[in-house]
Amino acid sequence: MLGRDKKDIIAVTMPCFGTTDRTYQNACEMSKKVGATLIEVPIADAVNVHFRDIGHDPEDHSVTYENCQARERTQVLMDIANKTWGMVIGTGDLSELALGWATYNGDHMSMYGVNASVPKTLVRHLVKYAADDTKDEALKNVLYDVLDTPVSPELLPPKDGDIAQKTEDLVGPYELHDFFLYFMLRFGYEPSKIFRIACMTFDGEYDKETIFKWLETFCRRFFSQQFKRSCLPDGPKVGTVALSPRGDWRMPSDACVAVWMKD
């Protein structure tokens, strides 16, 4: 597969209610610069039909509003893959899987999760490496702008053209969550020990109250979102930490977080 022409990579952009011009233009420009085949499938009309079918008010920007978009995108990708004899490459990463920050059977699902064991902090380093390595100045600029763009699923309407839904404002800094995840999975440390190490590591960057707040969020989400990790597509194990239910992390979906919260 590594020997195939880059035009065999089908990049699909599916603008909808939350898409900003910045991310749309970056996606299109990046796809063209790397030599991929770009397809645009606007999904707003299809999602509005779905809203009518299930009786959902489009002005109700609840989780249903968001997840309908994510699942419509997955349906489009799956069907394009069937049509082109291809496979859907997942965009989710290890950090999102740990927090369950994905729509069940939406972006949570693919035919191969290539980033399944790559944490968000490493994704950023990889993008920067690609930007520094390329001789194409236009591509370099796009990649650096991607790094400067707030992480967002863009499922809620923008505010004055800017991203309104910022992931790290909602679930916390990924550098903290990736830190928590590593020490929990790699060494099996309990929350109290992870907290002490995090306070020393991030001294001067985050105060103890902030670290405690997001560690608590991490623990609650890690346990409550296991059901999404119990049915993951295949993906490679890149580092020492992964959450595959087949070879790395097996945990009942109804596991209780109470003991951890007491710690």
Where are the language model's segments positioned?
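ATP/NTP-dependent adenylation/nucleotidyl-transfer catalytic domains that generate, transfer
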Residues: 1-263
